[in-house]
Amino acid sequence: MLALLAASVALAVAAGAQDSPAPGSRFVCTALPPEAVHAGCPLPAMPMQGGAQSPEEELRAAVLQLRETVVQQKETLGAQREAIRELTGKLARCEGLAGGKARGAGATGKDTMGDLPRDPGHVVEQLSRSLQTLKDRLESLEHQLRANVSNAGLPGDFREVLQQRLGELERQLLRKVAELEDEKSLLHNETSAHRQKTESTLNALLQRVTELERGNSAFKSPDAFKVSLPLRTNYLYGKIKKTLPELYAFTICLWLRSSASPGIGTPFSYAVPGQANEIVLIEWGNNPIELLINDKVAQLPLFVSDGKWHHICVTWTTRDGMWEAFQDGEKLGTGENLAPWHPIKPGGVLILGQEQDTVGGRFDATQAFVGELSQFNIWDRVLRAQEIVNIANCSTNMPGNIIPWVDNNVDVFGGASKWPVETCEERLLDL
């Protein structure tokens, strides 16, 4: 535009210089296209109007008008460029959201940001087309975005598939939880059954132990059992339930097998209030076997610490304190003045395997019997020698008339136990 204006001004000045018009002549300035400048075509004379402006003023006014037009066009171009930049930014964002699809289409389209034509009308038209193109592309991208959201093959379907997958996982989880609950219930039932079985077994064992301790176990016959005292302690012992009446004579017989040496300990003891050693048979340390009556002592010539079964009998009478000692049916010793004229006091406690320091208690482990006892019988008279022989050689089974050896009359404590005993003949073979 500025070049066109300069050409017009130069043409007018040249014409004025050549023609040298007379004073008062007028010139008209007309905008010509670029090709008319070089053609050299003369311009028609324009009639002059009275009172018109001078050529300089008209030229100045035209220049100002053209300048204003240029400024307006610059402002329009600036506004259009700003709009283009804004739309281009939106387009870039939309193309980014569309995953690059619109960018591919835009790359093959026309470049709307190239050099602009110099004609203002063309510029405006070109800008309008560019804006329309940008709007169309923006609408296309928005349409694609809406299609992406609503299209059944993309996110919506993915969301549905995800929901289905989550539902399937939830059902699997519920099934697994149900299986775990079933396994837990089954395990609880098995545990309960196992616990009940264990408790039943323990109860049976406890009942068996109780029966053994109380002597309620069944043997071939009531006297076919033995008491086992395997350790030298102060808590393993047997107890005769019945007590003794007042006695002026007695015979005590038993079978024993000692497992300790030296000293078999105390096979039995009878204590009454005021006298813990009313009747005691004991072998302590390297001392010989002793019979105590009312704490009076008689040494017996018996030897039973070889670990074999032996049949032992002792007799006593208050008359002159006479006593006898038999081993395996043979009389090995006799004596007198053992607590003469002293009756055996009634109501005491008869213990197997321990020596009593008080009635029924205060046992001393060093005096405990270790081994097995059986056929412990007490009579209230002195048995004849032949009777003792017959008992010892298994010819006669004669229970004591005061204390018989029967299962329900013997309790065991502290780990002592009752077991079936060997037959009398088997014990004889062990002599």
Swiss-Prot record:
GO terms for biological process: associative learning; chemical synaptic transmission. Residues 1-15 form the signal peptide. Keywords: Calcium, Disulfide bond, Glycoprotein, Lectin, Metal-binding, Secreted, Signal. It is found in: Secreted. Likely to play role in the modification of cellular properties that underlie long-term plasticity. Binds to agar matrix in a calcium-dependent manner. Homooligomer or heterooligomer (probably pentamer) with neuronal pentraxin receptor (NPTXR). This is Neuronal pentraxin-2.
